[in-house]
C-alpha cells in the first residue's frame, strides 16, 4: 500500500514538473500574407494579429521575434502553412509591420508558444 502511494505521489509531482516545463522555441524564416479565408474557416484581414503554422492547434498564441531587430509580436494561430520552402510561420500583414519585415518580405524569427 505504501509503495503504491509513493508511486502515485511521484507521478503527480512529475506531471506538475512536465506541465511547468518551458516550451522549446522554434527558429526559422517567416513571411507574411494579406488575409482571406483560413483553414480554420475564419476570414481574416490585414489588421488582425494572426498566423499560419503547420502543426500548432488553432487558437494557440505564440510570440514571434524578429532575430535581426529584436521586435516581437503575439499572434494567434488560425491557419495552416506556410507552404513556402524553408519557412516555419506566415504572419498577418499587421504582425509583419510590428516585426519590421514589410520591406524585406521575410525575416529570420524565433517562435515561442505562450
Language-model features, listed with the residues they occupy:
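Secreted/periplasmic proteins
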Residues: 2-13, 17-114
